[in-house]
Amino acid sequence: MGCRCCKIIQSYLFDPVQVPSPGYVNEVNSCKLDEDDTDKLKGKWSSEVLVQKNDPQRQGSKKTESSSRTADPWEPCWPHQGPLPQGDAGGEHHACGVNGIGPAATPQPTGNSSPTQDDRGSWASTANTVPPTQPFLEGGGTRKQDCVLLASEGTQVMRNGDSRAPSEAESFALEVQDHVFQIPAPDYLQHWGPAGDNVDHNEKDCVFKNHTEDESLEGIQPPVGEHGLNTPFSVRRSWDSLNEDVETEVLSICFNEKGPVHAMPVVDSGNRQEDTHGSDGDGDGEIVDEDAAVAEALAALEAATAGEDLDETD
């Protein structure tokens, strides 16, 4: 019992690999592979294939033994061992089992039909997208399985309406908006558009204000010598007082040049000015008083000049 054939027979008897029925194909595909069991089974299958390749004469006995075991209803069916594929290197091979199930698949319990799940994820959401006849690949084929699973997970996420993809698209759109160039405002004054209209309106308002101020000043301050009944009482009073002051100064200068005899009209005019400031009469009365004062001043001047003429003639 120390030959290789006996060891292989013992491995078949004590370490059987259960092959599920065709009804459990999808469930077996939905199960996750166990890495430890995969490594063990891969070593066993590689050793068995090498033994069969080196000893082709013993294949007949293996076939008879396998057929006798398949006849027993209490023992599971064993997959037929084939030769090593030519394209594999380093002892790795692709094993195709019954119904497209590889020998590395772990047995599925008949009592529990729900898929298992661990920390590395589950195949339950992606197993239905994989065809049931697709074999599990060993060695270099595991990378292809990972790629297929990643692609199927991406499609499952998009079908379930996950918000991850829209959020990434929105963030990309926001980044594009942040990189949009903004044109700075010009430094020069623009005389077109709303800004130019505002400038024109401001200038027009300033011009109109200046005109109104000039007109108001002209209306409030009439030129010297213009005294009418249409002007306000306070304005006429101020201009009358100013004119009287000028006239009294002129008369006082004339009388000082002529002599001290004619000082009386100046005093009278001063008293008359105080009377005009203190009185609240009508403008007509003030104008009459002013005319009387002027007449008196002219009479005094004529009398003075007449007296001088008489002195000269004497």
Curated annotation (Swiss-Prot):
Keywords: Cell membrane, Membrane, Phosphoprotein, Tumor suppressor. GO terms for cellular component: cell periphery; plasma membrane. Residues 107-116 have a biased composition (Polar residues). Signal peptide: none annotated. The modification Phosphothreonine is found at T106. One of its GO terms (biological process) is regulation of cell cycle. Induction: Markedly down-regulated in colorectal cancer tissues. Acts as a tumor suppressor. Acts as a tumor suppressor for colorectal cancer cell proliferation by targeting KEAP1/USP17/ELK1/CDK6 axis. Interacts with KEAP1; this interaction prevents the ubiquitination of KEAP1 by TRIM25, thus protecting KEAP1 from degradation. Found in association with PDCD10 and members of the STE20 kinases, such as STK24, STK25 and STK26. This is PDCD10 and GCKIII kinases-associated protein 1.
